[in-house]
Amino acid sequence: MLARSVELFNDRGFDGTSMEDLARHLGITKSAIYHHVSSKDALLGLALDRALSGLERAAADVRTMDGSAVDRLESLVRRSVEVLVDRLPYVTLLLRVHGNSPVERDALARRRKLDRFAAALVKDAIDAGDLRPDVDAAVNSRLLFGMVNSLVEWLRPTSTHTASDLADAVARAAFDGLRSR
């Protein structure tokens, strides 16, 4: 039920989807939906948690890693790509919320914590001399994770690209550059 609901939220927008639309899409009654969740917002919360829990787990793993800040940052980028590929519809939905409800605001607060962690890693890597100092750490972080997040715009579940291949491509482009040597 959750996966099919997220599919509809991504197609129509969360605010543009009614419980009646969900029931029709799922082929069940509204009361059957309410048997499982208390509201459309509760359903949204479950979906956003599916995306955020994977991203938070990736960040927690990176926090405990040994190694340089740039190595940990690269690991965070790779893990974020893997989560995005594995949970594509859920991450797509997460990237489309704007804070219109308490559920959305909670998700955005959780996402901001992840953003701050990534920006701190970028700053530490700059301070260590492993990343260029001529671009602000927060800007670098936004650009880096903007590249990761842009995958939701073109990646399809039927894609032949594996999570590992995409993680390698993003990491190479971000950390080694696009220019041939």
For the regions a protein language model found, what residue spans apply to each?
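Hydrophobic alpha-helical connector segments
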Residues: 46, 57-86, 141-144
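Helix-turn-helix
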Residues: 4-42, 46
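Amphipathic alpha-helical segments used for helix-helix packing
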Residues: 72, 83-103, 119, 153
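Generic detection of well-ordered alpha-helical segments
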Residues: 3, 7, 45, 49, ...
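Helix-loop "lid/cap" segments that line or gate small-molecule binding pockets
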Residues: 61-62, 78-85, 93-100, 173-178
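Amphipathic alpha-helical packing segments from all-alpha helical-bundle domains
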Residues: 53-57, 86, 103-128, 137-142, ...
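Hydrophobic alpha-helical segments that form the core
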Residues: 79, 135-153, 165-177
